[in-house]
């Protein structure tokens, strides 16, 4: 698993355990412990109109669940939904992202060893396979990925009135108020933003801070980048890479060299982009027109918290 994650995303063994394998083990342990109680019938109050009868909730599986997982945390975000779907009594079709082929092969090997294909099956492939699967009538669809594909998933599901869970990306700001502990805020922002090279759906997309603290916040962020990744992050063996050339080019094109105050370096050969901070950014800049999903952190300011 570690070697596959290293090849796909450049993750270190520590990061792989902290953000993927360890969390999967935790979920397995939790569901093994709690599934028996979750599966029990639970007595509930009976409405007066049904007086003299008894009412209860009886948990039951949906049936066949389609899990479509992303490439950024390919092991965690494939296996965790699988664990929960199985615990709820469902059969599952797994469709991992085509962008993480090495991890996909490991997952398929594990599934083939542990499950009958009539119970859990893995479908590998790209857009054609996604389309083919979405044309089928599943009882539940669990999708993690972009808003664009999420709309397609919901549209296809609506044809069969299939319930869905959509965990989608977006431009989520980290708002820093002027009373904040800037040293602590910077440490947490740098960790959350540049973990997995910014390829995290819950990472702060950009900073929106009080204009009075912007300069000091940027200084603290620069200190934390050096502390966490060293003076030359691209030479840090624990610093990962962008998933593929397409996304490397997309992220690289969002960087305005004239607004870079930290980082900006890149290595096309290894698909790495150094932790980057951009200042004097406006909401009209290219970097603010889409989810960044990479190690680029724009800093914007507001005059009052009400404005933010």
Name these PLM-found stretches.
Residues 1-56:
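N-terminal Rossmann-like NAD(P)+-binding subdomain of aldehyde/semialdehyde dehydrogenases
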Residues 270-274, 290-296:
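Conserved glycine-rich beta-strand-loop-beta hairpin in the small C-terminal domain of fold type I
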Residues 47-184, 302:
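Rossmann-like NAD(P) dinucleotide-binding subdomain of oxidoreductase/dehydrogenase enzymes
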Residues 23, 99, 128, 181, ...:
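Residue-level recognition of oxygen-bearing side chains
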Residues 57, 243-246, 297-300:
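Glycosyltransferase donor-binding loop in the core domain
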Residues 148-283, 304-306:
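ALDH superfamily catalytic-core signature
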Residues 28, 89, 120, 141, ...:
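Residue-level signal for inorganic ion chemistry
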């Amino acid at each position: 698993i570690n070697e596959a994650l290293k090849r796909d995303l450049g993750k270190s063994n520590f990061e792989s355990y902290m953000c993927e394998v360890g969390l999967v083990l935790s979920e397995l342990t939790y569901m093994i412990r709690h599934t028996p109680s979750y599966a029990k019938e639970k007595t509930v109050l009976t409405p007066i109109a049904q007086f003299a009868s008894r009412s209860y909730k009886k948990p039951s599986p949906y049936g066949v669940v389609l899990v479509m997982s992303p490439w950024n945390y390919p092991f965690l975000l494939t296996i965790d939904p699988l664990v929960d779907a199985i615990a709820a009594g469902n059969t599952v079709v797994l469709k991992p992202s085509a962008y993480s082929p090495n991890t996909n092969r490991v997952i398929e090997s594990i599934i083939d060893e542990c499950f009958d294909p009539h119970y859990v099956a893995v479908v590998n492939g790209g857009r054609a396979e996604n389309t083919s699967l979405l044309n089928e009538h599943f009882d539940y669809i669990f999708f993690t990925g972009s808003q664009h594909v999420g709309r397609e998933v919901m549209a296809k599901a609506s044809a069969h009135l299939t319930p869905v869970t959509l965990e989608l990306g977006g431009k989520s700001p980290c708002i820093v108020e002027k009373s904040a502990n800037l040293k602590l805020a910077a440490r947490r922002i740098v960790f959350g933003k540049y973990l997995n090279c910014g390829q995290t759906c819950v990472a702060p997309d950009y900073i929106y801070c009080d204009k009075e603290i912007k300069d000091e916040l940027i200084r603290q962020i620069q200190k934390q980048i050096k502390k966490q990744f060293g003076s030359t992050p691209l030479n840090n063996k624990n610093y990962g890479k962008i998933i593929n050339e397409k996304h490397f080019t997309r992220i690289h094109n969002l960087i305005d060299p004239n607004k870079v105050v930290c980082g900006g370096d890149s290595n096309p050969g290894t698909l790495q982009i150094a932790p980057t901070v951009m200042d004097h950014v406006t909401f009209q800049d290219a970097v603010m027109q889409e989810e960044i999903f990479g190690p680029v952190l724009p800093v914007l300011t507001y005059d009052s918290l009400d404005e933010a």
